[in-house]
Swiss-Prot record:
Its main location: membrane. Residues 1-38 are annotated as: Disordered. Changing residue 520 to S: 3-fold reduction in the uptake of sulfate by fibroblasts. It comes from Bos taurus. Residues 1-18 have a biased composition (Basic and acidic residues). One of its GO terms (biological process) is chondrocyte differentiation. This is Sulfate transporter. Glycans are attached at residue 194. Sulfate transporter which mediates sulfate uptake into chondrocytes in order to maintain adequate sulfation of proteoglycans which is needed for cartilage development. Mediates electroneutral anion exchange of sulfate ions for oxalate ions, sulfate and oxalate ions for chloride and/or hydroxyl ions and chloride ions for bromide, iodide and nitrate ions.
Length: 734
């Protein structure tokens, strides 16, 4: 029977389906929603069914899966050496050698220079501000952004992303630094004051607080970079797929609350110890309210003035970004104005405001990470590495797709890994791509990675010449800059209604991750989000949608009878769809919902046995004196159907428990005279059934490539039975 396009049935989807199927009808078929539940399954019996021959497909020849041969083949391929392979390996690891010789100077240079300069100008104040978040001196933030920009220029494959400091990673680094400083016996309250000096910070016997802080930060950065390079080498970038958009969004928002909380003390001019560990957000607010009377009025006024300037200007930049050739570098203007006001007004001497202090020029001698610290920070570096590469890879792929080019995910992991490993020897902390700066970079005309070189040149100018001029800059200004840059993450709450309409499960994941990241800790929040997301995936497959199917008139299409009306149910056959993999988690639910929608063969068999026993008690003897044998199969009323067709199109895979469940279901139904047919099994499911010996050699005809084929087979086989049985059983409903 072919699908008729000229005279289609007037059917439409059900208005409100609570139900049992997530499939929708194919295009060209209109299904009318069902208004009332259908209690009578057998209301339609189409006639003149077209009988077509069985479909037989010849499987492809399978490749040899011998593990030993596979390993030997891979080793032979890896150990082969030629000039071409060496060239490809070098060019693959250093993408700059591929694209730089082809650089179109006339076409790209203007956009790259403009975007690089603008991002560099924006990075200067953010690098200084985020250094406080990471528990470091301002100079180290400038080092970090400088080296990251240069290294990604050499190793990166994305033309648009901006790699440098990222607030969430700075927060995570800062928590580790504070913990190790406390263990080492440094006075964090005293260290939060203005007594910061980088002169002669390393001696033969001692290392001051700022020295030890960057040692911890660079060690964590080194370990995180090693993890990221290892992920690229072993090609385990798939780990990032477990960080869904909802999970990452909730994590960033929750961590943003922690960042905001950590900056409040700078806005108020309070000298408070930085809380770390579980419940740090609540602990910090308790410290703030207990010391609110000690607020430095000068810092408070400065913070309010900076907020009044930064917030409106940032909103104007966002609203008119399509009309502005470049965003207004308001942060740089604020820093310059605040530094001048603090210097000439002598705010530190008169009012005791907290200032950035001495920022040296030039570069410090390289220093290796502290190998003795690695065992203590190895676990902390795992979350930092995963978050860093997940954000970098996702942003690079997003902008590559937008601009029509490709990036290599594994090479991106190498790039971000070495952006952490190499700078860790030069007093730097962890970096990754950042969305806000990437958007600025793209909108200002960035064409290639050359833009990163221009950004590095701006930072180099600051490091060599301008940095000491920020001596009088108030830390409250840096705190305001950090908080204002969180507005994007904190404004995600306005997207929740739309997220709720699209997916309630994703919204719950977002809330759970956000609350755990904010109220417990960032690391535990990330772990909680991942575990809860995986639990939600299991939950979705534990009790999935299941329904009985009916035939769309004048077609070979079957759809859910609970979702659509005017579907035709064939007498004597029930078609069951299960929308999930069949495995150990949902095997019992599969049986229960199948029995509920058809019949429970175990109960039917028990009823048959009881009826047989009663009949045996009333046994009769034939006139010839020979006792009749009581047939169990004829000792009960005929069942209303003879065949169950299980639609396996939505069953992605089977495990051992799933195969045993199908065997058990088939055995139970056959015991009461009902045959079970499987239809639309994908090749993976067919292979699992073959390995699990679901069918014997003479039973392979019980697997069908379409539901309609299975239904036709069931009708034909039943008709043959009825021809051999006078007054055969009636399979119509009462």
């Amino acid at each position: 029977m072919s699908l008729k396009n000229e005279d289609q049935n007037d059917l439409s989807p059900k208005d409100s389906v609570k139900g049992n199927d997530q499939y929708r009808a194919p295009s060209g078929i209109h299904l009318e929603p069902e208004e009332e539940s259908r209690n009578d399954f057998w209301q339609f019996e189409p006639s003149n069914l077209f009988r077509h021959p069985r479909i037989h497909l010849e499987p492809q020849e399978k490749s040899d899966n011998n593990f030993k041969k596979f390993v030997i083949k891979k080793l032979e391929k890896s150990c082969q050496c030629s000039s071409t392979k060496a060239k490809n390996t070098i060019f693959g690891f250093l993408p700059v050698l591929q694209w730089l010789p082809k650089y179109d100077l006339k076409k790209n240079i203007l956009g790259d220079v403009m975007s690089g300069l603008i991002v560099g100008i924006l990075l200067v104040p953010q690098s200084i501000a985020y250094s406080l978040l990471a528990g470091q001196e301002p100079i180290y933030g400038l080092y970090t952004s400088f080296f990251a920009s240069l290294i990604y220029f050499i190793l990166g494959t994305s033309r648009h992303i901006s790699v440098g400091i990222f607030g969430i990673l700075c927060l995570m680094i800062g928590e580790v630094v504070d913990r190790e400083l406390y263990i080492a016996g440094y006075d964090t309250v005293h260290a939060a004051s203005n007594e910061s000096s980088l002169v002669n910070q390393i001696s033969d016997k001692t290392c001051d607080r700022s020295c030890y802080a960057i040692i911890v930060g660079s060690t964590v950065t080194f370990v995180a970079g090693v993890y990221q390079v290892a992920m690229g080498f072993f090609q385990v970038g798939f780990v990032s797929v477990y960080l869904s958009d909802a999970l990452l969004g909730g994590f960033v928002t929750g961590a943003s609350f922690t960042i905001l909380t950590s900056q409040v003390k700078y806005l108020l001019g309070l000298s408070l110890p930085r809380s770390a560990g579980v419940g740090s957000l609540i602990t910090t607010w308790l410290h703030v309210f207990r010391n609110i009377r000690k607020t430095n009025i000068c810092d408070l006024i400065t913070s309010l003035l900076c907020l009044l300037v930064l917030l409106p200007t940032k909103e104007l930049n966002e609203r008119f970004k399509s009309k502005l050739k470049a965003p207004i570098p308001v942060e740089l203007f604020v820093i310059v104005a605040a530094t001048l006001a603090s210097h000439f007004g002598k705010l530190n001497e008169k009012y005791g405001t907290s200032i950035a202090g001495h920022i040296p020029t030039g570069f410090m001698p390289p220093k290796a990470p502290d190998w003795n610290l690695i065992p203590r920070v190895a676990v902390d570096a795992i979350a930092i590495a995963i978050i860093g590469f997940a954000i970098t890879v996702s942003l690079s792929e997003m902008f590559a797709k937008k601009h029509g080019y490709t990036v290599k995910a594994n090479q991106e992991m190498y790039a971000i890994g070495f952006c952490n490993i190499i700078p860790s020897f030069f007093h730097c902390f962890t970096t990754s791509a950042a969305l806000a700066k990437t958007l600025v970079k793209e909108s200002t005309g960035c064409q290639t990675q050359v833009s990163g070189v221009m950004t590095a040149l701006v930072l180099l100018l600051v490091l060599l010449v301008i940095a000491p001029l920020f001596f009088s800059l108030q830390k409250s200004v840096l705190g305001v800059i950090t908080i204002v840059n969180l507005r994007g993450a904190l404004c995600k709450f306005k997207d929740l209604p739309q997220m709720w309409r699209i997916s309630r499960m994703d919204t719950v994941i977002w809330f759970v991750t956000m609350l755990s990241s904010a109220l417990i800790s960032t690391e535990i929040g990330l772990l909680t989000g991942v575990c809860f997301s995986m639990f939600c995936v299991i939950l979705r497959t534990q009790k999935p949608k299941a329904s009985l199917l009916g035939l769309v008139e004048d077609s070979e299409v079957f759809e859910s009878m609970s979702a659509y009306k005017n579907l035709q149910a064939k007498s004597g056959i029930k078609i069951f769809r299960f929308v999930a993999p069949l495995y150990y988690v949902n095997k019992e639910y599969f049986k229960s919902v199948l029995y509920k929608k058809t019949l429970n063969p175990v109960l039917v068999k028990a009823a048959q046995r009881k009826a047989a026993k009663r009949k045996i008690k009333r046994e009769t003897v034939t006139p010839s004196g020979i006792q009749d044998e009581v047939s169990v199969q004829l000792s009960h009323d005929p069942l209303e159907f003879h065949t169950i067709v299980i639609d396996c199109s939505a069953i992605q895979f089977l495990d051992t428990a799933g195969i045993h469940t199908l065997k058990e279901v088939r055995r139970d139904y056959e015991a009461v005279g009902i045959q079970v047919l499987l239809a639309q099994c994908n090749p993976s499911v067919r292979d699992s059934l073959a390995r699990g010996e679901y069918c014997k050699k003479d039973e392979e005809n019980l697997l069908f490539y379409s539901i309609y084929e299975a239904m036709t087979f069931a009708e034909d086989s039943q008709n043959q039975k009825e021809r051999h049985i006078p007054n055969g059983p009636n399979f119509s409903s009462d």
